[in-house]
């Protein structure tokens, strides 16, 4: 629901933003009618945990109330937005977030009952991505370098000049006037 305040109005002009829990709950009967029993919700809303990246002894924020309002048929909720990492149980459901910018990978393990096809257990673990220790992919590196060469004449040309001071202090979306210019 907070998206219109975080992005350019032009980017969301034709979109509707509805209550997250009501929207999910309205779709559950349709999923059930199609035989779906294991339901995982991906939502761009999050929480503010305490603890390390694989726990959350005390979590607050919008996601807590949203999860509590979800239909009991929802088994797992994968969250985002707050750029915080956690693996929680909220109202008897697994709720996860994998931090920000690919710094963590969340592995979710669901066990399904073969007869009912419903989730009988769910657990997750966040793993730190140690990208500095990984070897570069030669083919991918060559592709990136070829586009860098193609873009260089344009990228190296000044697009304008600014005489005012631009703030680098980010807003709630993580954007700043200086960042927008760059």
Please provide the spans of the model-predicted regions:
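Non-catalytic terminal accessory segments
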Residues: 32, 119-120, 131-182
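Acidic, metal/ion-coordinating pockets
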Residues: 1-133, 139, 177-182
């Amino acid at each position: 629901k907070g998206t219109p305040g975080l992005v350019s109005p032009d980017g969301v002009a034709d979109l509707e933003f509805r209550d997250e829990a009501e929207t999910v709950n309205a779709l559950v009967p349709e999923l059930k009618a199609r035989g779906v029993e294991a339901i995982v919700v991906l939502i761009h809303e999050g929480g503010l945990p305490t603890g390390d990246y694989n726990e959350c002894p005390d979590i607050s924020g919008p996601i807590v109330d949203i999860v509590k309002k979800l239909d009991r048929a929802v088994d797992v909720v994968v969250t985002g937005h707050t750029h915080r990492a956690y693996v929680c149980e909220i109202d008897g459901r697994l709720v996860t977030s994998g931090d920000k910018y690919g710094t963590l990978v969340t592995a979710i393990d669901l066990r399904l009952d073969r007869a009912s096809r419903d989730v009988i257990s769910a657990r997750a673990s966040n793993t730190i991505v140690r990208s500095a220790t990984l070897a570069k992919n030669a083919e991918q590196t060559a592709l990136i370098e070829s586009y860098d060469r193609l873009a260089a004449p344009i990228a190296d040309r000044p697009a304008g000049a600014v005489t005012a001071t631009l703030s680098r202090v980010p807003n709630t979306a993580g954007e700043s006037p200086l960042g927008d210019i760059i």
